[in-house]
């Protein structure tokens, strides 16, 4: 490792003991291994495609099948993506890295070994800063250490439900490039573990190096869990394997913590084991114990030369890196005046952040808070309801900005803007950037701002609602709101609310 991280990471090893995170008097210690598939078009050592969802054994080459006489050739795109990740987590980079063979037998591993990086990984020590949410109004920042991240090839997949009574092997996934990310044992609760996993997931998608679709197996997590009394030596750890949803990760860790506490409280000992989580029964159970563990007998792969990376290559990749989530979040707070919460939501994905900035670019920067409210509330709410991503938004950034401009110049009230937004979402204005203006014109949604016209409506409402007027003059403030509502109803929501309030007060007081 000979490329230093850009920021000091001495804080990685330091832990603030948080007694509020103890469970029944035990401190929880968690370390995490993440297997993330890299989104290259071809596999790490062959030209076979990496597409997901094809018929079994149609995406495997002779290299992936481990046929005699074939040699692996390293995919340069895999190296570039790994370097991006290393830069993104402030890590030391292995400008000299090598590949090793991890030897074990399993039906979905045709060569009888997996090519990985044991001795000299491409990414060394680094860290990632996260925000941990331990419940309502209980958030805190924490720096999580990363031990290393190394390249390796994925294995195939055993298929248990294709033929009754038999297990098949699908080698489409064999040879798909992986980066395995190994954390320090820095997490002290399931919430902290989940915050770390989500931060890594956000980073790899933000950098564009992985689609990280957990349901497709392109982002898989193994969690090492142990417990101890405060100040004691580390306890015996167990490993929760192949957790593939955020919801199950948190539940599985909590169930395993409870299981280990029950064992120790009953006077027993936790046995080092690989665990499975059963979501239907909401429990963890032993898959195999330490005695069953493999001796992988690592040794250097003789078919692959060491990888030597020029510093110029690293500098070029670093220069082309997008602004990272933490930096963008800070800029949204400092330059645009957004709250920490708003900035965090708007940097939840690179696509959301880009969309928001595209909206702000079309309006006055001072109105960034208004844009944030519409993007976070109305737009993301509608998209989530329809199970869509921001890239599938039926409203373009320029169209939303056009609607916000009409709010700003008083063409639209907030209530009318909701109607225009709904029409935009249903694509009533088509693809044109000025779709909001077309909808306002066609549907007659322009706000009434003529003082004389509004005053006439107010006078008519006062004349028809004498009882409510007397209640207001008698000191019942709620009656005033009732009169405002009657004016808005009479104007079909088009009257400017501020002018309605002003004129109504002038006529009643």
From Swiss-Prot:
SMART domains: GatB_Yqey. GO terms for molecular function: asparaginyl-tRNA synthase (glutamine-hydrolyzing) activity; ATP binding; glutaminyl-tRNA synthase (glutamine-hydrolyzing) activity. Allows the formation of correctly charged Asn-tRNA(Asn) or Gln-tRNA(Gln) through the transamidation of misacylated Asp-tRNA(Asn) or Glu-tRNA(Gln) in organisms which lack either or both of asparaginyl-tRNA or glutaminyl-tRNA synthetases. The reaction takes place in the presence of glutamine and ATP through an activated phospho-Asp-tRNA(Asn) or phospho-Glu-tRNA(Gln). GO terms for biological process: glutaminyl-tRNAGln biosynthesis via transamidation; translation. Signal peptide: none annotated. Pfam families: GatB_N, GatB_Yqey. Heterotrimer of A, B and C subunits. This is Aspartyl/glutamyl-tRNA(Asn/Gln) amidotransferase subunit B. The gene is gatB. It comes from the Bacteria. It is an enzyme of class 6 (ligase). Belongs to the GatB/GatE family. GatB subfamily. It catalyses: L-glutamyl-tRNA(Gln) + L-glutamine + ATP + H2O = L-glutaminyl-tRNA(Gln) + L-glutamate + ADP + phosphate + H(+); L-aspartyl-tRNA(Asn) + L-glutamine + ATP + H2O = L-asparaginyl-tRNA(Asn) + L-glutamate + ADP + phosphate + 2 H(+). Transmembrane segments: none annotated.
